[in-house]
Amino acid sequence: MRTLASVVALALAAAAPPAAAADTVHYRLSATLDPAAHRITVAGTMRGPDGKEQPVSVDKVIHHPIEAQGEDYARGFAETTGTIQSEGVFLSGASDWYPRWGDALVTFDLTVTLPAGWSAISQGKRSKNGDQVRFSCEQPQEEIWLIAGQWKETTRKLEELETSALLRERDDALAAKYLDATATYIAMYSKLLGPYPYAKFALVENFWETGYGMPSFTLLGGKVIRLPFIITSSYPHEILHNWFGNGIYVDPKSGNWSEGLTAYLADHMFAEQNGGGAAYRQETLQKYADYAAHAKDFPLSEFRERHSPSTEAVGYGKSLMLFHMMRREIGDAAFVKALRTLYQEKRFSRSSFDDLKSAFATASGKNLNASFAPWVTRTGAPQLRARDVQAALHGDEWRVTGTIEQTQAEEPYTLAIPIALTLEGKDTATQTVVRTTGKETSFVLTAKEKPLRLDVDPEFDLFRVLDVEEAPPALSGAFGAEACTMILPAGVNPEVLTAYQQMANAWNEGRATPMKVVTDAELAELPQTGSVWVAGFENKFAKAAAAALEPYHASVTRTGDRAVVRVARRSKGSADVIAFVAAPHAVQLSGLARKLPHYHKYSYLAFEGDEPVNVEKGRWPVTDSPMTALFAAGDVPMAKLATRDPLAELPPAFSKERMLATVNALAAPAMKGRGQKTPELDRAAEMIASAMKDAGLEVLPADPEMKNVVGVLRGAKPEWKESSVVVGAHYDHLGMPQDAKMFPGADDNASGIAVLLELARQMAGSGKPSRTVIFVAFTGEEAGLLGSKRYVAAPSPWPANKTIGMVNLDTVGRLASGKILVLGAGSADEWIHIVNGAGYVTGAPVSAVMNDPGGSDQKTFIEAGVPAVQLFTGANADYHQPTDTPDKIDGAGLVKVAAVTRELVAYLAERDRPLTSKLGGAASKTAAAPSGERRASLGSIPDYEFPGPGVRITGTTPGSPAEKAGLKEGDVITKLGATSVATLRDLSEALKALAPGDTVDVTVLRDGQSITVPATLAAR
């Protein structure tokens, strides 16, 4: 088995630098930096392509301002051509700190003398000697970079590869996280593309916010580095640039191909790895349509760099879609072969789009002139329409006929158009490709089964201008609109009105055509054309926004202190949108002004707090795409499409197979449901203790009163010796009642134990955390949280009142296409940040649910004053049923749950201060007496993400009182008997006061009407 280090070592061994090109210039330089005086002095020699050596002498002040560039308000980065100052040094070839020889590539030996406590970074091998740093770069480069600062440096060696993190303040945990990621990404891309081309890679923290990728290092701003999603988005993108862009250089005469290719192999590939490739492409096409397609488009051959949303939509979006179409055209094997060959032959030289086309053609043996060149040289994109699509029975065979049109005014493109046909009785779709070179192409498909629907380009594989009904309305429709009006609420207090005005001003900066900004008092009606922002709950046009949102059942009414954003089409088929934005407090609006451009792909958002913090986001469903033809009445879902493997996979941190094996063992028939006080439950405890020991945990002696299984991973910081993070999951279930039906408890909660044990293995193998992490398999949860109550009450070296936070894993095995719900996120201010960060880092779908129904072991910790959450993959009809079996567990989902849990626990293990508890001083109070165990069940399946008031249900369990009473999906329970129900906990408490067999009135809201039905409760 190859280790990560050995993979990297093999890659480096094959990465010998090519001989310098004949037109390369070699520099031998000594530079001295005086940051306080903004001065650099340089002495040395340069040897030109003619072989003649010339002296170099430079003595100059360089202190150019750091200024925002272009209209890229969504990114907010500033730039400089060069600066030397006390905060740091940033010099590129454009800074003229050394003489340049035209466009010639360079090699160099550079020695930099620095003030005490300073260090420097550039290309090439790096060595230090006192206050001097030397760089030796044999690989031809486009320019010489010189960056300097006062950093705390962490370095690791992977065989011959040196990886470093240079941070302005010491942060060992952050450095370790980035160094782990560096090794992982370099190994993955070396395997995919060929050997990493340099002897080092460094993460360098800049003294202002930047996002630069240089050969062998990346220069990121301090805030950027600490954004949770950067390590799985921008960071691999910058590492990959060492192959394309900083390994093979862009021929400046041909257009910049490297950004699109890098975005495809990093950002898009990571989305593919998480099952989101089609969604990523849909968002890419929507961004092109909203920002560039109509007035700001240009050929790829003219793209040089991003400086606005429109240049990004073309230079990154259109380009990555070109590479995706090439991959679909020639196949994965030929696509990868072409990239590897290009890298091997063109490393440290300049390449063009034509070189890429030749590489793809050679690898595939195909003539790609018609399917490649037009995307580079032409402005625009095809627009598709499917018409006259019909299904008819001919004898014993069904025929589906139709015509696909290219409706753009320009010449047609050569296209391979994917089509998916959903057939009656078939789980998987029949997929084919229709090839077209003209404006119209007819097709005939045949099938034995009855066709139900046909979808054209269902996975957004073609670069094209989307029909507006193919994608949901999103903020990009407002930010990208040429004609846009922002309507402010005249009737609000002056502070809030000023904040809305400042928001409009911020968004107008850099716009080619500024938004028109007016108040609602100045208008009798909405503008007839263009997109519109309606600002403020009090705005008289809020009703118009609400009317436009009716198809999505969305509201614009104020809910507490939430800031809300909602987007709808102004009319069906219109590209113009109406965007509603409102916040109760002026302080929230400054944050929204800064943040919303980053959320351009979303249809709806909600924020809380002063910052404010995002707590809800999403895209409306697409319900009426013109690229879909239905042959049957009703809402017919598209059948499953063939799975596609990503071009490369990250090495898994967690074993799906091992977790499924744990579930199978605990839920096996021989375990008889792991009922209370049974030999089988004792056997489960022994299995768990053995697994913890094998994982490397210190397993504590069993408590004779309550058989919790406790494994400890001791922390490294002695000053935190009493502090801990608790990770919990209960291992008991309902056993085998008198009717002899076994309740396997696979999801509830063998799944939680499986994730807990896998996380223990991973964390124990990754070195000591700063704070002790305690893994607890609780018993007695089904009998009233007995095990967790015993843990909290019992004497311990890690007392409950020193626990920074608790993460509970309960019923986490049925993720599928749903979300990982994190219940109880309202128990501390920071949970929402931690949860959102975990979602960004892992790519897993997460939702922080502020309320906590209080049904599992986290409740015990919350009552003891410990901020605690439960991870949960949602209720289902098999809950507490004999049908909760191992075959229904989603192994891939367990991996995602484990990844999210690791992020939560790792953060808590390194956090240097307590969480900001929202438990109302519970830590200093005696926990309330339990209100009793719930015995009665209604059988409704709650929607845990519904914020209330009331409990919305997603369905009912078969044969349950709720089903018999006629409750159905979408109902909102507002009353049980005489008890009002505002939250899920209210419903749970109301049921505790009732018994099986009781008949109670259930009041629900259905389609805006309140109805009451009787239900006879069953045993839980």
How would you label these PLM feature ranges?
Residues P472-E649, A653-F654:
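Solvent-exposed alpha-helical segments and adjacent loops
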Residues A909, L915-R1020:
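C-terminal recognition in membrane/secretory proteostasis and scaffolding
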Residues R170, K177-Y178, T184, K768, ...:
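Metal-dependent peptidase/peptidase-like ectodomains
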Residues A20-Y196, R328-I330, K346, P382, ...:
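Acidic/His-enriched low-complexity segments
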Residues L368-N369, P382-D457:
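Beta-strand-rich binding/interaction modules
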Residues A661-A665, R674-R714:
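A non-catalytic alpha/beta surface segment that caps or lines the substrate-entry region
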Residues G711, V727-L785, T901:
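Alpha-helical metal-binding/catalytic segments enriched in His/Glu/Asp
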Residues V25, A165-T403, Q408-A409, P769, ...:
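Hydrophobic alpha-helical and helix-loop surface patches within well-folded domains
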